[in-house]
Amino acid sequence: MTKKLTYLLLFIPLISLSQGISLNVSQDARLALIGDERGNGAFTTNVNLAAEFRGWQKGSSYFLMRPEIEYADLKGGELYRMTANFGYTFNKWVKNVDFTATVGGGMLSRHGLGGLHTQANLQTTWYFTKGIGLFLDSEFVQRVDLPKKFVGYSGKVGLKILLR
């Protein structure tokens, strides 16, 4: 109980200081549609859930912080990742379209082992109605559970909902 209360108290300043909050839900497109070369078939679950806390608008962009969790039901074992991302969103270049670049790092768990990872994301969001957008996310990630690969790539499709 005290652990949950501590986490809640840590998020209160983020919520009160942020100029906007959104909820992002995404799925790895390749794993959803065709699978991959590691034996994961189509319809493999690989879901990301993120909360995006926006800073003050400065010109054509704003700073953001995006904590994120990922769950993937992969062949050979489940993957859990927690990431803290920081970056900028450029939202004044094209009407109803945001361009976001972030970098982040965090922890992952797979095959009973834990480790650190780093990542960089490029995301494009198209708002098809007020407060709801569809996004494409290109993720470049360094994970300890990927043998013989320094950087892996993932393309995600998702929904962004502006809460405030």
Question: What do the predicted segments below correspond to?
Answer:
Residues 48-52, 85-89, 121-123, 158:
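Outer-membrane beta-barrel architecture
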Residues 26-34, 68-72, 87-89, 104-110, ...:
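Outer-membrane beta-barrel pore domains and translocons
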Residues 33-39, 71, 120-164:
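Predominantly the C-terminal beta-signal and adjacent terminal strand-loop region
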